[in-house]
Amino acid sequence: MDYTLTRIDPNGENDRYPLQKQEIVTDPLEKHVYQNVYMGKLEHALHDMVNWGRKNSLWPFNFGLSCCYVEMTTSFTAVHDVARFGSEVIRASPRQADFMVVAGTCFTKMAPVVQRLYDQMLEPKWVISMGACANSGGMYDIYSVVQGVDKFLPVDVYIPGCPPRPEAYMQALLLLQESIGKERRPLSWVVNDQGVYRANMQSERDRKNAERIAVTNLRTPDEI
C-alpha cells in the first residue's frame, strides 16, 4: 500500500498546510520487518494497538459555522447514538480535541479564526469537511466565502450534501477511523524524525463505482 509522508511543521515555516512537502512512499514498517522479524512484528503490533486506541476515542471539537452543524449535533441524539463510535465527548477547547469538523459556510473573515483554532489542537489531529459549502463553497461563489476549507486546512474526509444527513457524518467517522488505523506516527515524542505516514485512501465514489454500475434493479424512493 502506498503512503503519503507529511512532515509536521512545528516552527510555522509554511503559511498553508496543503503546501507542505509530500512524498509517495511505501509502508515505513516493512523494511524493519525484513531486517528484524521479531522487532519489526513487535513495532507493527504497537502501531496497530496505538492506532486502535486513537481511532476508537475520537473527541470532536465543538465548532460549527452554519446549518450543517445542526445535522452534526443531531447525530449525538439517542436516535443515532454516535457514542457507539467513541466520539460523543464534545470538547469546548481545541487543546483537548482530536479532530475538527468544519460544518457549514466558511467566510473569509472566519478563515483565520478556524486556522488559529486548528493550530491550537495537539497532534495527532484530523479535519472533516462537512457539507457542500465547506467542501467547495457550495452555492456561494462570491468574494466573501472561502471556496473550500482545504485551501488552508489539510482535510482528511469530505462529506457531500446540503446539508448532509447525520448518517453521512457517522460514515465519515468510520472512514476516518479506517484511515487512522493505517497511519504510521511516532510512538513517542522523544524521536528525531516527526514524519507522519498516512495511507492514500480511495474515494467512496471510485471504490463503489463498479458495484453501482452493476446494479440492474433500482429501488423505489419508498424502499430507500
Swiss-Prot record:
Recorded GO MF terms: 4 iron, 4 sulfur cluster binding; iron ion binding; NADH dehydrogenase (ubiquinone) activity; NADH:ubiquinone reductase (non-electrogenic) activity; quinone binding
Q: Note the superkingdom of the native organism.
A: Bacteria
The family classification in the record reads: Belongs to the complex I 20 kDa subunit family.
A GO cellular-component term linked to this record: plasma membrane
**Topology with regard to the membrane?**
Peripheral membrane protein
Q: Which cofactor does it need?
A: [4Fe-4S] cluster
Q: A single GO BP annotation from the record?
A: electron transport coupled proton transport
Q: Where in the cell is it found?
A: Cell inner membrane
Name the top EC class: translocase
- Enumerate the residues binding [4Fe-4S] cluster: 67-68, 133, 162
Report which reactions are catalysed by this protein.
Answer: a quinone + NADH + 5 H(+)(in) = a quinol + NAD(+) + 4 H(+)(out)
Name of this chain's protein: NADH-quinone oxidoreductase subunit B
- Give the quaternary structure: NDH-1 is composed of 13 different subunits. Subunits NuoB, CD, E, F, and G constitute the peripheral sector of the complex.
Tell me, what's a Pfam family for it?
Oxidored_q6
Source organism of this protein record: Erwinia tasmaniensis (strain DSM 17950 / CFBP 7177 / CIP 109463 / NCPPB 4357 / Et1/99)
Q: Which UniProt keywords apply?
A: 4Fe-4S, Cell inner membrane, Cell membrane, Iron, Iron-sulfur, Membrane, Metal-binding, NAD, Quinone, Translocase, Transport, Ubiquinone
